[in-house]
Every structure is written in structure tokens, then in C-alpha cells.
Amino acid sequence: DVPDSLDWRQEXLVRK
């Protein structure tokens, strides 16, 4: 489940 925004990648890096 990934949003169309590229923010998910940045958040992933921040969260992980």
C-alpha cells in the first residue's frame, strides 16, 4: 500500500 506521492519514500527512510 503506497500513496501516489513520493513522500512515502522519504518517510520510509525517516521511519526506518
Curated annotation (Swiss-Prot):
Keywords: Hydrolase, Protease, Thiol protease. GO terms for biological process: proteolysis. It comes from the Eukaryota. The keyword Calcium does not apply. The keyword Hydrolase applies. It is an enzyme of class 3 (hydrolase). GO terms for molecular function: cysteine-type peptidase activity. Its EC number is 3.4.22.-. Belongs to the peptidase C1 family. This is Putative cathepsin-like enzyme. It comes from Fasciola hepatica. The lineage of its organism: Eukaryota, Metazoa, Spiralia, Lophotrochozoa, Platyhelminthes.
